[in-house]
Design a protein with these regions (language model features):
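Short, basic/aromatic recognition patches that contact phosphate-bearing ligands
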Residues: 1-91
């Protein structure tokens, strides 16, 4: 598979995708992750994304997975701030 222009940024883009497109109630599939990375001109295979998710977990990002039928969904379970805390900061 040809490498994209932004390959060195793959881990950061993956973190952004997980933070922006998921929460404890909404996950994202591996195919959706791959498509999202392609929009950043980053090519990736499932195995490399599994390793990247493990690295993000080691870094402290609370990435969890769950199965729904045949699909596995990934999501960020906890955030730096909860919605109520953000509202308090804004007020």
């Amino acid at each position: 598979m040809a490498k994209g222009v932004n390959q060195k940024l793959k881990l950061l883009y993956l973190m952004d995708i997980l933070l922006e497109k998921t929460d404890e109630n909404h996950g994202i599939t591996m195919n959706e992750i791959i498509s999202s990375l392609e929009s950043y001109d980053v090519s990736a295979e499932r195995k490399s994304i599994y390793r990247d998710i493990e690295e993000l977990q080691r870094y402290g990002l609370d990435v969890l997975s769950y199965n729904n039928g045949r699909a596995t969904y990934y999501h960020v379970a906890s955030r730096l701030f909860e919605i109520a805390e953000l509202k308090l900061l804004v007020d």
